[in-house]
Amino acid sequence: MKKIIFMGTPSYATCILKALVENENFKLVALFTQPDKAVGRKQILTPSDTKAFLSQNYPSIPIFTPSSLKDENIIREIKDLNPDFIVVAAYGKILPKAILDLVPCVNLHASLLPKYRGASPIQSAILNKDEKSGVCTMLMEEGLDTGAILESLECDIKDKNSSEVFELLANLAAKLILTTLLNFDKITPKKQEESLATLCRKIKKEDGLINLQNARELYQKYLAFTPWPGVFLENGLKFLELELVDELKQNARMGEILELEKESFLLACKQGVLRIKKLQESGKKALDGRTYLNGKRLKSEDSLC
């Protein structure tokens, strides 16, 4: 039975953690995750998704929430746990060389490396209209997602939003980590092709700001930034649910309401048409498209804003 230290934080990581802790071939000896964070208007101290899962279901397994992994006491603690592997998935902290050198550190990255190294591989794949994505297991080194690839699995992501792709890739990663660790001694690590490498940065709230220039580009942003940060106009109006109707139509005014439907409406972009199904003004409740227009006394051929 191989001893595992798992390092991960969000729900994506929880899916992988669950697969490991439930598998009889592995023994989870510790979880490392981000410290509890103050959440919401009341700033309630809230544990990470992985910590909440493990403490509720496996309370005897130790959980560590260090502010830094460079602390000598933390490194000593990891040595004392004597793991066979350290598995990392969306942890949110960089592992120092002192830890990387202890045992094989296997990272699960949500892209087909070397494409989309960095913090937002799923959103970047959607923004770039990729129809395929996947997940890789890789041997960690000091560079950002530059380690040798062990195994990978591919899937279709066309017309899926980030939330859906996260769930899809989390399930793939949960399967992949088991095969990678069980077959570790038989796998020949493959160096990444540096000439094909691309980087992606962390998503910020302001990335959700949209205009009505291009319906296809707006739709891709909507898919990429659902559920966070969402997409919103400069006046704060959020589009919560929408569909791409036409990519090419250009014979209407940008922002013109083209047609009212039972619970939605068609909206003209400079290029293309969208169906707006649900939207929300800042500080107000979400409404279906038709109800919103009725409340604003807007009709066909009027401008949305």
From Swiss-Prot:
Its EC number is 2.1.2.9. Signal peptide: none annotated. It comes from Campylobacter jejuni subsp. jejuni serotype O:23/36 (strain 81-176). PROSITE patterns: GART. GO terms for molecular function: methionyl-tRNA formyltransferase activity. Attaches a formyl group to the free amino group of methionyl-tRNA(fMet). The formyl group appears to play a dual role in the initiator identity of N-formylmethionyl-tRNA by promoting its recognition by IF2 and preventing the misappropriation of this tRNA by the elongation apparatus. Belongs to the Fmt family. (6S)-5,6,7,8-tetrahydrofolate binds at S111, L112, L113, P114. Keywords: Protein biosynthesis, Transferase. PANTHER family: METHIONYL-TRNA FORMYLTRANSFERASE, METHIONYL-TRNA FORMYLTRANSFERASE, MITOCHONDRIAL. It catalyses: L-methionyl-tRNA(fMet) + (6R)-10-formyltetrahydrofolate = N-formyl-L-methionyl-tRNA(fMet) + (6S)-5,6,7,8-tetrahydrofolate + H(+). The gene is fmt. One of its GO terms (cellular component) is cytosol. It comes from the Bacteria. The keyword Protein biosynthesis applies. It is an enzyme of class 2 (transferase). NCBIfam families: fmt. This is Methionyl-tRNA formyltransferase. InterPro entries: Fmt (IPR005794), Formyl_trans_C (IPR005793), Formyl_transf_N (IPR002376), Formyl_transf_N_sf (IPR036477), Formyl_transferase-like_C_sf (IPR011034), GART_AS (IPR001555), Met-tRNA-FMT_C (IPR044135), Met-tRNA-FMT_N (IPR041711).
